[in-house]
């Protein structure tokens, strides 16, 4: 994990990678919990027997489950010591490029697109690539916008 002492340190890093997370296992239990939380019980996610005979050869994670992992992936990729809180401001683009099969591992690679100072903090636009272990193509690519406050 990279640790930046001050939020202002990120201003000079626009266009550069700012961190890469640890690998995270996507197991059936996580997929089932997400299905319960969202009400999305499609068989490609929660029925291992049927999904094994389906188009992906195994159950796959919901696309929105993959996207929802961004906070935990951010947390293991980098931290800014003087930031007391952060809030999601939005997403500019999201693409689900590859399916995430049960038993796969994913990680986040983060590139700072822009740093905009705000009163008491900054707005960060970050290109988040959720990589899929063993695959050339990522699972998900998203441009996130967050506000961090010191």
Task: Give, region by region, the residue ranges found by the protein language model.
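Catalytic strand-loop segment that frames the active site of acyl-thioester-processing enzymes
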Residues: 1-61
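HotDog/MaoC-like acyl-thioester-processing domains
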Residues: 1-13, 99-150
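A generic structural signal for short beta-strands and their flanking turns/coil linkers
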Residues: 14, 20-22, 30, 40, ...
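Generic structural detector for well-ordered beta-strands
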Residues: 19, 23-25, 95, 145-147
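Hydrophobic beta-strand-centered segment that forms part of the acyl-chain substrate-binding groove
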Residues: 54-58, 68-109
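A solvent-exposed, acidic/Ser-Thr-rich amphipathic alpha-helical stretch
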Residues: 64-66
């Amino acid at each position: 994990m990279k640790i930046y002492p001050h939020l202002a340190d990120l201003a000079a890093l626009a266009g550069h990678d700012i961190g890469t997370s640890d690998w995270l296992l996507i197991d059936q239990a996580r997929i089932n919990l997400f299905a319960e939380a969202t009400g999305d019980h499609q068989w490609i996610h929660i029925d291992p027997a049927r999904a094994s005979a389906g188009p992906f050869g195994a159950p796959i994670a919901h696309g929105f489950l993959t996207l929802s992992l961004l906070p935990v992936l951010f947390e293991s990729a980098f931290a800014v010591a003087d930031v007391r809180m952060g809030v999601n401001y939005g997403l500019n683009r999201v693409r689900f490029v590859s399916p995430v099969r049960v038993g796969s591992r994913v990680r986040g690679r983060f590139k700072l697109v822009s740093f905009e100072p705000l009163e008491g903090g900054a707005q960060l636009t970050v290109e988040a690539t959720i990589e899929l272990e063993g695959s050339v193509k990522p699972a998900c690519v998203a441009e996130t916008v967050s506000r961090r406050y010191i």
